[in-house]
């Protein structure tokens, strides 16, 4: 009988085959039938369906066949295509270039010295462009108000071997878990009654080497930046943090705004970041948005585990009950926000 590893590998290869024709022509990925007023056709996932989708998406994104989704590599592009295909299947509207779900981003040439230094010991491949995958669920009563849900697609790719000889930095927790969360939330909201506000789902490329995807989103956003009511970035939620209750998540910059406390009032299991000395608020894609004045925070449960940025950040280390519960716990609070008239605000001296 085939091994579980072989079955996972086969599923990835089949998925790559299924989207290979789309990779040749990104326009064919999204077609021209979707519009900003597209009507999602899916139903919201049950708990069993959510668990199944979370397992499937994580297995794809963190598989060795994606070689760690290195920033600005073919494998990151495959991850972006995978997300774009999911968005299209859900009946969401495209938020990328020219009516597609992909935003193509040219990297500077030559790359800045800090980036060259960061990738010096990783796979030697041309890194000239990255990709964002973006989808839109248009609101009803106040479509001009936007809730932005984000994560990053990439990890480190192929690099120095660890003690076991593993050279693939799979990035299961960082940040396949966050990408999976955004895809699951997209499915949940696409299958529910349309919210009052618009929801934008954005998966950024090349966060690990300097936030190039995020910067391109800010430079050419699918909606006016001033229309964004709030941003939640999902980063490393695949394992529980012993510093907080097992069913909880933490929010970076919790005291900077009234956003976290209000989400908690509406059912989110959110606490203040228990690792303030790590400056996580400034270390994720939310920070660039916050510097534009957007209320933007990162949701996480990163425990400072030793697998961070190592080949050992593998699918086998993921706490799936925690991950699925974490995603499910955010559905109602985000749905409340998407249907509310309330707007979060910075606390005194909270805006960076």
Regions found by a protein language model. Give the residues of each.
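N-terminal hydrophobic or amphipathic helices/low-complexity stretches enriched
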Residues: 29-94, 137-138, 143, 347
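Bacterial N-terminal signal peptides
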Residues: 11-25
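Metal-dependent peptidase/peptidase-like ectodomains
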Residues: 142, 194, 204-298, 302-307, ...
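Second-shell loop/turn segments in exported
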Residues: 40-48, 64-74, 119-124, 163-175, ...
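His/Asp/Glu-rich mid-to-C-terminal helical/loop segments that flank catalytic regions of hydrolases
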Residues: 191, 306-352
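Acidic/His- and Gly-rich active-site-bordering loop/insert found
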Residues: 61, 87, 123-161
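A non-catalytic alpha/beta surface segment that caps or lines the substrate-entry region
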Residues: 69-137
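Alpha-helical metal-binding/catalytic segments enriched in His/Glu/Asp
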Residues: 133-135, 149-210, 330
């Amino acid at each position: 009988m085939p091994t579980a590893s072989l079955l996972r590998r086969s599923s990835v290869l089949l998925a790559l085959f299924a989207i290979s024709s789309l990779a040749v022509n990104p326009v064919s990925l999204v077609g021209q039938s979707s519009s900003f007023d597209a009507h999602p056709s899916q139903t919201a996932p049950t708990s069993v369906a959510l668990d199944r989708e979370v397992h499937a998406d994580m297995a794809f994104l963190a598989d060795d066949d994606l070689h760690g989704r290195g920033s600005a590599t073919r494998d990151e592009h495959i991850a972006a295509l995978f997300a774009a295909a999911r968005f299209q299947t859900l009946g969401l509207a495209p938020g990328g270039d020219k009516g597609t779900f992909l935003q193509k981003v040219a990297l500077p040439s030559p790359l800045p010295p800090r980036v060259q230094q960061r990738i010096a010991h990783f796979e030697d491949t041309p890194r000239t462009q990255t990709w964002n995958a973006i989808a839109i669920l248009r609101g009803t009563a106040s479509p001009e108000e936007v809730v932005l849900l984000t994560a990053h697609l990439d990890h480190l790719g192929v690099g120095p071997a660890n003690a076991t000889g593993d050279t693939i930095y799979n990035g299961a927790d960082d940040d396949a878990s966050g990408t999976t969360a955004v895809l699951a939330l997209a499915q949940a909201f696409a299958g529910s009654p349309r919210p009052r506000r618009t929801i934008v789902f954005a998966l950024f490329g090349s966060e690990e080497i300097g936030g190039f995807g995020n910067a391109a989103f800010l430079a050419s956003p699918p909606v006016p930046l001033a229309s964004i009511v709030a941003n939640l970035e999902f980063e490393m939620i695949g394992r529980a943090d012993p510093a907080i209750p097992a069913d909880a998540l933490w929010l970076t910059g919790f005291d900077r705004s009234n956003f976290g406390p209000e989400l908690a009032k509406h059912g989110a299991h959110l606490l203040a970041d228990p690792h303030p000395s790590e400056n996580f608020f400034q270390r994720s894609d939310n920070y660039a948005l916050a510097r534009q004045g957007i209320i933007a925070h990162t949701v996480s449960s990163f425990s400072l585990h030793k697998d961070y940025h190592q080949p050992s950040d593998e699918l086998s280390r993921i706490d799936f009950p925690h991950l699925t519960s974490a995603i499910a716990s955010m559905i109602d609070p985000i749905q409340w926000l998407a249907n509310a008239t309330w707007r979060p605000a910075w606390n005194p001296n909270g805006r960076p």
